[in-house]
A protein has these predicted regions:
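Conserved catalytic submotifs in the C-terminal HATPase_c
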Residues: 57-62, 83-93, 129
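Short conserved segments within the C-terminal catalytic ATPase subdomain
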Residues: 77-86, 118
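Conserved glycine-/histidine-rich ATP-lid loop and adjacent helix of the Bergerat-fold HATPase_c
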Residues: 160-169
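Short acidic helix/loop segment immediately C-terminal to the autophosphorylated histidine
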Residues: 12-19
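Conserved E/DxxT/N motif and adjacent residues on the DHp alpha2 helix
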Residues: 37-55
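Short alpha-helical segment of the dimerization/phosphotransfer core of two-component systems
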Residues: 31-36
């Protein structure tokens, strides 16, 4: 917030700044204001979750269809910077989840932040453990695990994701340093056949 206010004051009060500098400062103000807004919104979302004010829908959903849609969405918004491969032997699997929240979860794991200009090779590995009755998702190369400790907004997003998954009886684990690369693993209890 101090950066945004400081640059804004500099722009409005300084008559000595060149027009190019004012444009550059304007871009910095815009970027920092957007980051601040995302941070505040993430905090508010986490606060609603922790206070119990957010209620999830518990509905039967075909998870493979949700994953295919999530991968396709990420490819579209990734502007050619994302190579995503779905690695699974599951054709169809029902789980109990909130479809909108599950889509948001996938988006957070597959789509890099707007200011992240890196390219990513992501593998979405999905397996069903019949003995345990759980579906395991392993998102290898996820931008969210790469930037795990880079900013507070990312930490809050991990907390939001974990809260959602725990509400449905699953686990959520972030590993930023593995031989496969940064990854997130989460599990989901299976429902139906």
């Amino acid at each position: 917030m101090n950066v945004v206010v400081g640059f804004a004051e500099l722009l409005t009060e300084s008559k000595e700044l060149a027009p190019e500098a004012k444009v550059e400062y304007g871009k910095m103000i815009q970027e920092n204001a957007e980051n601040l807004l995302k941070y505040v919104n993430s905090i508010l979302e986490l606060s609603r979750l922790e206070s119990g004010k957010t209620k999830y829908k518990h509905e039967g959903c075909e998870v493979m269809s949700l994953c295919r849609k999530g991968v396709e969405f990420a490819r579209q918004v990734g502007n050619g910077r994302l190579a995503i491969r779905l690695d699974t032997n599951i054709q169809s699997q029902m789980i109990c989840t909130d479809e909108n929240w599950f889509s948001t979860l996938l988006s957070s794991l597959l789509v890099p932040a707007e200011n992240d200009k890196n390219s990513y090779n992501i593998v979405v590995r999905i397996r069903y453990d019949k003995e345990k009755g759980i579906v395991t998702f392993k998102i290898i190369g996820t931008p969210l695990a790469k930037s795990r400790f880079e900013n507070k907004t990312t930490l809050i997003r991990h907390e939001i994701n974990a809260h959602f998954i725990h509400a449905f009886g699953g686990i959520y684990k972030v590993q930023s340093d593995t031989h496969e690369g940064p990854l997130v693993i989460f599990t989901w209890p299976k429902t139906g056949d």
